[in-house]
Amino acid sequence: MIRTLLLSALVAGALSCGYPTYEVEDDVSRVVGGQEATPNTWPWQVSLQVLSSGRWRHNCGGSLVANNWVLTAAHCLSNYQTYRVLLGAHSLSNPGAGSAAVQVSKLVVHQRWNSQNVGNGYDIALIKLASPVTLSKNIQTACLPPAGTILPRNYVCYVTGWGLLQTNGNSPDTLRQGRLLVVDYATCSSASWWGSSVKSSMVCAGGDGVTSSCNGDSGGPLNCRASNGQWQVHGIVSFGSSLGCNYPRKPSVFTRVSNYIDWINSVMARN
């Protein structure tokens, strides 16, 4: 019981998470076409990397939610790959002092995830690190929102990651950020937007044809600032349009984290 309560406090944001050492620059930068983020402004952002031909390569993003747990998307994971997590990095080629590369001890994918039906939802997973990381100005835990929280239309959030700078484009070496406005569920699920592909367990953001997430951003956070100034991870990058990363009326779609708080707590408590 004590362990469960402690984990609940952590993911609810009670342990000084969500306040980066360096202030986020509030501009209209974007991931697609991209603006470089200021180093260490998103200290819970991680690079999930796979071992390929003897080298570690960026595969997906993720968010550190405890000193030994990372939150990411289920579609990022496979039982046939070897993973590690890079934390505290701004440049992937030169992570520098203050970064840490940690092996993975366990992958926990939501039991209802179906890789053949992404639109069904449940695109969420937790990664247990082989050893806890030391928190610092470069490496901090993310805050998660209270269970059931629904963001209003046009709420300002940021997507972050090392995804492609444009559809079929190059991958950046340094972390990017993109300012996105939340699209309410009624609009996003309408026929001229995403239709029935979007469920109420998801969050839509963007859709202006300019700013979006892209391949390589998957699993990373949708960061939204609460009224008290605390940054919370409200979404996990899940999917976008096959027509292009920044196609009009096809906003980036995220797993809505507030729908899975109980699941997150349960997994962390059991493992």
From Swiss-Prot:
Protein name stated in the entry: Chymotrypsin-like elastase family member 2A
MF term (GO), any: serine hydrolase activity
Reaction(s) catalysed (UniProt annotation): Preferential cleavage: Leu-|-Xaa, Met-|-Xaa and Phe-|-Xaa. Hydrolyzes elastin
Assembly and oligomerization: Interacts with CPA1. Interacts with SERPINA1.
Tissue and organ distribution: Highly expressed in pancreas (at mRNA and protein levels). Also expressed in adrenal gland and small intestine.
Enzyme class label: hydrolase
Domain Peptidase S1: residue ranges: 31-269
Family the UniProt entry places it in: Belongs to the peptidase S1 family. Elastase subfamily.
Top-rank lineage group of the source organism: Eukaryota
List of catalytic residues: 75 (charge relay system), 123 (charge relay system), 218 (charge relay system)
One Gene Ontology cellular component: keratohyalin granule
